[in-house]
């Protein structure tokens, strides 16, 4: 009986000793920006000494990096979850995406391409302009054909 009590206490002591508290270190993250096709692209890369990490930003998840296109109105927050064994810890970050994209998109701002306007307005303007140019080209072509054929007909009559 005493042997079972001692064996039970030793089992409890050994089980308690194996559950170690994991000391999570904050991951080192780097956020870079680029101007591509009048869009502010962001790349979030993180490194850690733990087993695994996941980065979440704008409904995108990446293991060590996340690539996204940022526009005004999008969230300025991202989080990094670090895993070690069965334990994990989430670190929340806020970054001034608007200010950084504003600086990155300097040339696009010069041509009024940043911040992006309502897509419907841009598409509507483009369609109306394209239609106007097409109609103008058609009218000019028809007038050219009409007057050229008339001139050639008149010149044929003048010939003896």
Swiss-Prot record:
Subcellular location: Host endoplasmic reticulum membrane
InterPro entries found in the cross-reference section: Adenovirus_Gp19K, Adenovirus_Gp19K_sf
Stretches of the chain found on the membrane's Cytoplasmic side: 146-160
Any GO BP annotation: symbiont-mediated suppression of host antigen processing and presentation of peptide antigen via MHC class I
UniProt keyword annotation of Disulfide bond present: yes
Motif (Di-lysine motif): 157-160
Disulphide bonds in the chain: 29-46, 40-101
Glycosylation sites: 30, 79
Modification(s) after translation: Both disulfide bonds are absolutely critical for the interaction with MHC antigens.
Broad class of the protein's primary localization: host cell
Pfam families with a match to the protein in the record: Adeno_GP19K
Residues passing through the membrane, by range: 125-145
Membrane topology: Single-pass type I membrane protein
Swiss-Prot/TrEMBL keywords: Disulfide bond, Early protein, Glycoprotein, Host endoplasmic reticulum, Host membrane, Host-virus interaction, Inhibition of host adaptive immune response by virus, Inhibition of host tapasin by virus, Lectin, Mannose-binding, Membrane, Signal, Transmembrane, Transmembrane helix, Viral immunoevasion
Leader sequence segment: 1-17
Protein name from the UniProt record: Early E3 18.5 kDa glycoprotein
Species in which this protein is naturally found: Human adenovirus C serotype 5 (HAdV-5)
């Amino acid at each position: 009986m005493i042997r079972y009590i001692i064996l039970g206490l030793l089992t409890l002591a050994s089980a308690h000793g194996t559950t170690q508290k994991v000391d999570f270190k904050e991951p080192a993250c780097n956020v870079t920006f680029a101007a591509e096709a009048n869009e502010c692209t962001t790349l979030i890369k993180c490194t850690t000494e733990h087993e695994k990490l996941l980065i979440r930003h704008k409904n995108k998840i990446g293991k060590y990096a996340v690539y996204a296109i940022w526009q005004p109105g999008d969230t300025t927050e991202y989080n990094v979850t670090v895993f070690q064994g069965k334990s994990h810890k989430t670190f929340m970050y806020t970054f001034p995406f608007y200010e950084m994209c504003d600086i990155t998109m300097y040339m696009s701002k010069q041509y009024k391409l940043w911040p992006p306007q309502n897509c419907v307005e841009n598409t509507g303007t483009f369609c109306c302009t394209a239609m106007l140019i097409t109609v103008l080209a058609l009218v000019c072509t028809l007038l050219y054909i009409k007057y050229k054929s008339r001139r050639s007909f008149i010149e044929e009559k003048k010939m003896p």
